[in-house]
């Protein structure tokens, strides 16, 4: 019997930037287009559903999407706590540095640059 060893090469992807516990929850999805994992989320005032954070108001992001969505899902899973790598988060293109820095103010989420 011949055994062949295969060495897997993986890219090191670090999404966490601290040792805070990262807890998840599920919520109603208001997302209607394909959305990558690690996208900041906010509550839609009209529907009460979780949608992609628009980057307009600091402190209004309440979660980070755990898994990518196709846009047809009625529910989603999101991180409700933890410290994430700033570089790993899929930020809105229009967000400025001040709003990004304080996106999760008042929540159990935070972010920091990786060393």
From Swiss-Prot:
Keywords linked to the UniProt accession: Capsid decoration protein, Capsid protein, Late protein, Virion
Keyword Transmembrane helix: no
Origin superkingdom: Viruses
InterPro entries: Head_decoration_D, Head_decoration_D_sf
Main location, first listed in the record: virion
Subcellular location, record wording: Virion
Presence of keyword ATP-binding: no
GO annotation, cellular component aspect: viral capsid, decoration
Family membership: Belongs to the lambda phage gpD family.
Chain's role: Stabilizes the head shell following the rearrangement of the gp7 subunits of the head shell lattice that accompanies expansion of the head.
UniProt protein name: Head decoration protein
Organism: Enterobacteria phage P21 (Bacteriophage 21)
Taxonomic lineage: Viruses, Duplodnaviria, Heunggongvirae, Uroviricota, Caudoviricetes
């Amino acid at each position: 019997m011949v055994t062949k060893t295969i060495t897997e090469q993986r890219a090191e992807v670090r999404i966490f930037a601290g040792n805070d516990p990262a807890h998840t929850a599920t919520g109603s999805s208001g997302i209607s287009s394909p959305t990558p994992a690690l996208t900041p989320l906010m509550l839609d005032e009209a529907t009460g559903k979780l949608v992609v954070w628009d980057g307009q108001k600091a402190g209004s992001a309440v979660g980070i999407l755990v898994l990518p969505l196709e846009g047809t899902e009625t529910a989603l899973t999101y991180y409700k706590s933890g410290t994430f790598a700033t570089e790993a988060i899929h930020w809105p293109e229009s967000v400025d540095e001040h709003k990004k820095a304080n996106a999760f103010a008042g929540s159990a989420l935070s972010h920091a640059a990786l060393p």
